[in-house]
Curated annotation (Swiss-Prot):
Family that this chain belongs to: Belongs to the tRNA(Ile)-lysidine synthase family.
UniProt catalytic activity: cytidine(34) in tRNA(Ile2) + L-lysine + ATP = lysidine(34) in tRNA(Ile2) + AMP + diphosphate + H(+)
Record SUPFAM superfamilies: Adenine nucleotide alpha hydrolases-like, MesJ substrate recognition domain-like, PheT/TilS domain
SMART domains: TilS_C
Keyword Ligase among record annotations: yes
Organism domain of life: Bacteria
Protein name (database record): tRNA(Ile)-lysidine synthase
Pfam families in alphabetical order: ATP_bind_3, TilS, TilS_C
Entry domain remark: The N-terminal region contains the highly conserved SGGXDS motif, predicted to be a P-loop motif involved in ATP binding.
EC number: 6.3.4.19
GO CC annotations, alphabetized: cytoplasm
Recorded name of the encoding gene: tilS
Amino acid sequence: MIPPHEFSAERVVFDALGVALSALPDDTPIAIAYSGGLDSTVLLHAAARIAGAGRCIALHVHHGLSANADAWLAHCAETAQALGARFDAARVDVPRASGQGIEASARDARYRALETMCARYGARTLWLAQHADDQAETVLLQLLRGAGIAGLAAMAPQYRPALADVVRMRPLLHLLRAQLERYAQQHALRWIDDESNTDTRYARNALRVDVLPALAPHFPGFRDALARTAQHAAAAQRLLDDLAAIDLRAVARADVRVLSRDAFVALDDERGANLLRYWMRSLGLPGASAARLAEMVKQLRAARDAHALRVDHAGWRLRLYRDDVQWEAGDGAASEAARADVADDDAADARDDRADASAAARLPACALAWRGHEVWRLPGWRGSFVFSPVAAHEHDAVPEALLSSAALRACARAGGERMRTWQGGPGRTLKNLFQERGVPAWQRDVPLLYVGERLLFVPRIGVNRATHDGADAPGGWRRIEWRPDMLIA
């Protein structure tokens, strides 16, 4: 960390951005999170100077949490225009009753909006304006919360979240706020002051306003010391991640979204919790507390069947089927047919599925006039049908002429549906086919794809040969896949 008096503010800011810029391919767009405050104003101004305003895209998120939010949006648009940078903004609704606090909810909403805007401009790099004072606040806040190694590592200079396309970079992380203030003064910059930054009801503000100023006279180097703590924690976390990666290779199936319970319980509790944390992060799931991870390990050790495992986390549910452990969406509306499968999955006298149509209709049928679509997104089902071009001889290839012959419909299971999995074979119930393939009951709540009134495709089973018998047809061919959102992301 460079003391504010050692070099000119402009030099240290330009040097910091120059290092970040050297890591990027020439002429790639640089997205900059621009709130209009001091820090992001300095970042945008300096980036426009050294990278060229044409490469910079100022992205503003309107949270609607302040009565001044509209004025801030207008200020940011005007400033970006004056610098010659492109500008975009997004309005978000921050859930106040999400259970994670208004600060965390606003942060999550902001990052989602920023990544959406980055995708709009093809930007793979997002510059954030956090500095050394922010890092000190973060480390201290994590210490007071009793965070583990990952929390103490605080903010990384460069980071790409799991399943994300955008790399987050913090080129100012080793600079002090005082240096940014001097830069802003030297260039007569104008910025906005968010009145909420002085509200000490928020934990971070309380540290900034009341605690850190009291530390400075007695521990003048506390920012450097806390930054070193973050660096040590980050190094330790990398070692834990390396260990977890080794364990994941040993415990996971060929599909890394599925773990072997028997292999998992061979690990000790600490190693098991470390693996779960790493696995969840690799899948893009929100992190869990140490207590929550310990409960997951405990239940996985004790569970002997699917009914004994009761773990819900952030809208997802940890499931056990035979020896397979995996996460499934936990808040979707399950069809009655899938519920019946759970009740008597392996009973010798398993009856045909029967269901109340009104229950299955919780997820309404969707229709598509297919005209060469490659992806049909179904938000209510948390997934998409994908139609990939293939050769006619490939397995489960379907002629495009059939797909466009009538409207495609995606419907919930009603119970009792039958299909043929090979030409000339007998019609069999979906339930029996699912069981034969070892598909867990909760994974059977999938949309069935119809062409007109004929069942064409069932996820995890394949094409219904009663509808398409494999005969030659003119034109192109497609393979149909069902991809849950966690695979698309």
